[in-house]
Amino acid sequence: VDDPAGFPKNSPAGWQKQLAECGRAAAENENAYRILLCHRPERTEAYAESGFELVLCGHAHGGQVRVPYLINGLYAPNQGLFPKYAGGCYRLGNDVTMIVSRGLCRNELPRVFNPPELVIVDIKSKNPSKG
């Protein structure tokens, strides 16, 4: 699902349409493990209700500035000060996991105590005999 800021001003619900289309496509095979790749992490309610087990996103730049061992980022785009979803693994309801990457890039502000990261996710079957 694209960044909502990338849609024309007269189409503010563009990301919601994309999410609905992705959800419909994922629902076609109810036995599949459904993964959603989206830009922004703060749309958690919509993601939790969309039928995916795993949500992968970024955009928050890890909170741009971090205070080691104290906070998960000082500021993140579109979340403001002390962002809730700056980087890491989060549970959205009972069945949805969201992983937010701090990413490799930077915003206008330099990263402080916030090294770039590349997230690698290993997905393994609960039933090894089924692959």
Q: What is the meaning of each model-derived region?
A:
Residues 1, 20, 27-31, 91-98, ...:
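Beta-strand-turn-beta hairpins that frame and shape the catalytic cleft
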Residues 1-34, 44-45, 110-111:
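Binuclear metal-dependent hydrolase catalytic cores centered on His/Asp/Glu-rich metal-binding motifs
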Residues 7, 107, 127:
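Flexible, glycine-rich phosphate/dinucleotide-binding loops
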Residues 33-35, 53-54:
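Short, Asp-centered acidic motifs that coordinate Mg2+ and/or phosphate
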Residues 37-39:
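Mid-length scaffold segments of soluble, non-membrane domains
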Residues 41-119:
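Conserved beta-sheet core of the metallophosphoesterase superfamily
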Residues 114, 118-131:
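C-terminal domain-boundary segment and adjacent tail
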